[in-house]
């Protein structure tokens, strides 16, 4: 299962306020819902691609939230600096194995 998510809640039209960290937490909140629907947990996640509008400014905060979310055994991850849609700071593509 692959999901590409942003910091825009499903019921919203703009990113959650609070910067890249808040957007990353919103992405993980949405992903938890998808994992629950698939009847798997975070250990099923095998890779993550992060797309950041401001890598230098935001990578430390995003890294901290990533570690909090995945704990001591995080999946493979790549981070890229990109030009995201207006107003967005983070986008993530998460891949999980469904057994």
Language-model segments: which ranges?
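Short, polar/acidic, helix-capping and beta-turn segments at strand->helix junctions
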Residues: 1-99
């Amino acid at each position: 299962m692959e999901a590409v998510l942003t910091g825009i809640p499903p019921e919203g039209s703009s990113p959650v306020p609070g910067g890249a960290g808040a957007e990353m937490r919103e992405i993980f909140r949405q992903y938890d819902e998808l994992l629950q629907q698939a009847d798997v947990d975070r250990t099923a996640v095998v890779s993550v691609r992060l797309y950041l509008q401001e890598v230098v400014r935001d990578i430390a905060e995003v890294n901290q939230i990533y570690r909090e979310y995945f704990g001591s055994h995080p999946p493979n991850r790549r981070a890229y600096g990109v030009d995201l849609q207006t107003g967005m700071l983070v986008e993530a593509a998460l891949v999980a194995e469904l057994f």
